[in-house]
Amino acid sequence: MILGFDTETCNGQLRVLASSSGHSISFAQNNYSLSDVETALKFLYEEGLAGDGYNVFWNINFDYSIILKPYIVEHEQELHDSRIAEIREKQRLALEQGNVTEHEADVYLRFQIGPYSLRLISHKGFVIKLKRKSVYFFDAANFYMSADDVHMSLDTAGERYLHVGKDEWGKKNRERMGSDPEFFDAHLSEITSYCIEDCKLTARLFEKTIESYRNLGLNFPEHPYSKASIFKQYLRDHETMTNCQNSYQTIKAAPIFRLIKDSYHGALNQIFGVGTFKNITDADINSAYPTAMRKLIDLTGAEMIV
């Protein structure tokens, strides 16, 4: 099962939060406060699917920044310091491995709002946790990219892949909805319906995503943060990750291993966790060296001679 979620705003404030189930909540203009943030999180937590199924937004960064806006404004310095601390930890790991990178993407932000624990993963999703239950939300737009490698709009993706666009009334009144509080209040029912239809379109597009991959014989991952999640699921299904470890142990035992390691100045994989880790394998479908990888020789069945 898939649930789509969406927000509607006016002058940068959350006014409507809805899901494809048809349920929604609304907030008064100029009155969205910290207590309302908890109300919104409660709606998402109780409405969202936990376990089997997926909860998806379209361009999730916008939605969670709007939902959390009062908290972000009040705790700006705290969140800034938290991000700095995690970036410094990444840099420390980079130094330990002989690599230093200025690219600080996908930093995890964790914080507490009322009884809810949140973890945000930039441009990919967020998790709401209460006691032992966690509800995950993902970005359906990550699977619909334009030729310029940017997210398609919901309207464009719907028309291209489902031959269904966004609601015409909403498209016609989009500007007034976003800037005129009196218009928003007068048409709250229509705007809520428009928001729910966007939720349904988001859910249908994500269903199309899953169907497309399954038609190729691929299992869809439990946590689809990005296209790389599909790739990693494929590797797990074919035990490629385990085979990589076996190959690595063979190479590591060779006398020339140190030369290989010392000459390597490529990408850096970072693990966010506490404790001792052994034999970690990771992979990413978006390689920085696609041309070189296409020229690699297939060494299946080869023997190493030292």
Language model: regions and residue ranges:
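Gly/Thr-rich phosphate-binding beta-strand-loop-beta motif of the actin/hexokinase/Hsp70
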Residues: 1-20, 287
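Short His-Asn-centered micro-motif
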Residues: 5-7, 34, 56-60, 139, ...
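Common nucleic-acid-contacting/processivity interface regions adjacent to the catalytic cores
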Residues: 11, 179-182, 186-306
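RNase H-like nuclease fold core
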Residues: 11-30, 298
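Short secondary-structure boundary/capping segments
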Residues: 18-19, 69-82, 295-305
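Active-site-proximal helix-loop-helix substrate-binding element of RNase H-like nuclease domains
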Residues: 29, 53, 57-69, 73-203, ...
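Short, basic/hydrophobic alpha-helical segments
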Residues: 33-54
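Flexible, charged surface loops at secondary-structure boundaries
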Residues: 45-52, 131, 273-277
